[in-house]
Regions:
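Tandem CBS (Bateman) regulatory domains
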Residues: 1-7, 43-71, 76-88, 95-127, ...
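Hydrophobic "anchor" residues
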Residues: 40, 211-212
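Short acidic/polar active-site loop segments enriched in Thr and Asp
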Residues: 30, 90-91, 147, 202
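Conserved functional loop/turn residues at catalytic and ligand-binding sites
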Residues: 28, 145, 179, 200
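Hydrophobic, helix-prone linear segments
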Residues: 1-41, 119, 228-230
């Protein structure tokens, strides 16, 4: 089984970070490949975007910006793609001038092969109060290398990135998503993933009697590879 991926969206390294932020928001994308003359310098994703926003450094050129190292693979076979993602701790790889992301991988997996419950994958979430400053939330995301945080609602790094021109001292409730996809820990993995794909969302809140827990796209890819679901 092979993963096709999508055409690369690239930008010149002499473009500015703020230009990349505007482009990402306008096109509703999470990452841009920084390249010149087919030479890929790196990937500028919501993670790097968040770093520059929180550090008030959006006027730098992309060639001087924080970038992800581009992981270029020789095969688009599903198992190999998942292994490359996990081994390199990356949410996207490049194959044959196309980019393959977690979402591309997850949509190719036959989740009906698994009888697992979503609670088997969930882990305790880091959450904040609605009055927490946007900057504080961004700093927590960077420190803990996470993209989603429950806030009696939920906020993702993308929400902050797409509001790059907002006052970072405002409360996070100004940009958080109120309607959250949440399920019981007894819900089947297959059902949950199907809904995530349909709604195009990157995480699900899992409820239990003690803690707020979360499952992300990375958790799904890791589980699929470890349990030979593909």
């Amino acid at each position: 089984l092979r993963v096709e991926g999508r055409e690369i969206i690239s930008v010149d390294p002499d473009a500015y970070v703020i230009d990349a932020l505007f482009f990402m928001k306008r096109n509703n994308i999470r990452r841009i490949v920084v390249s010149r003359s087919n030479n890929i310098l790196g990937i500028f994703s919501v993670d790097e975007a968040l770093y520059h926003i929180i550090n008030n450094d959006v006027e730098s050129k992309l060639k001087d910006a924080k970038l992800k190292f581009p992981v270029i693979v020789k095969s688009n076979e599903l198992k190999e793609i998942m292994r490359s993602m996990i081994d390199n701790d990356t949410d996207a790889v490049i194959y044959d001038n196309k980019i393959i992301t977690y979402k591309d991988v997850i949509s190719q997996i036959d989740w009906s092969k698994s009888n697992a419950l979503i609670g088997e994958l969930s882990k305790e979430a880091i959450f904040v109060e609605p009055y927490t400053k946007i900057k504080t939330v961004g700093e927590l995301m960077l420190k803990n290398k996470i993209r989603h945080m429950p806030v009696y609602g939920i906020v993702s790094s993308r929400d902050i990135v797409y509001n790059y021109d907002i006052d970072l001292n405002l409360s996070i409730n100004k940009i958080m998503i109120v309607e959250v996809y949440s399920v019981s820990k007894e819900e089947s993995l297959h059902t949950v993933v199907s809904t995530m794909i349909k709604r195009n969302i990157g995480s699900v809140i899992v409820t239990n009697s003690k803690n707020i827990e979360i499952v992300t796209l990375k958790d799904l890819v890791t589980f699929a590879l470890s349990n030979l679901i593909y």
